[in-house]
């Protein structure tokens, strides 16, 4: 089975080896058809702690690492300018 992958932006790097990644999806409203942006935050395991706030990263679903951590950071796609 292929693991799920998502692309998002790091919004918090305050924890050791852990990053909060915000992933935005654009969905159409069921009744009205208006396009809505929905953002979900994932807790991801960053082994080397290389990512910083604002970086665009790819995360992949994995086995549970802790109570809320089921994703690992695979790669940094784009570094933030700050």
UniProtKB/Swiss-Prot annotation:
Segment forming the signal sequence: none
Transferase listed as a keyword: no
Give disulfide pairs as residue numbers: none
Q: Which UniProt keywords apply?
A: Chloroplast, Plastid, Ribonucleoprotein, Ribosomal protein, RNA-binding, rRNA-binding
Please give the Gene Ontology molecular function terms for this protein: rRNA binding; structural constituent of ribosome
Q: What does this protein do?
A: One of the primary rRNA binding proteins, it binds specifically to the 5'-end of 16S ribosomal RNA.
Q: Name it.
A: Small ribosomal subunit protein uS17c
């Amino acid at each position: 089975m292929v693991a799920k992958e998502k692309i998002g932006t790091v919004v918090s790097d305050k924890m050791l080896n852990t990053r909060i990644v915000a992933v935005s999806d654009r969905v159409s409203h069921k009744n009205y058809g208006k396009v809505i942006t929905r953002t979900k935050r994932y807790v991801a395991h960053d082994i080397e702690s290389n990512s910083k706030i604002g970086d665009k990263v790819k995360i992949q679903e994995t086995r549970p690492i802790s109570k809320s951590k089921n994703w690992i950071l695979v790669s940094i796609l784009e570094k933030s300018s700050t």
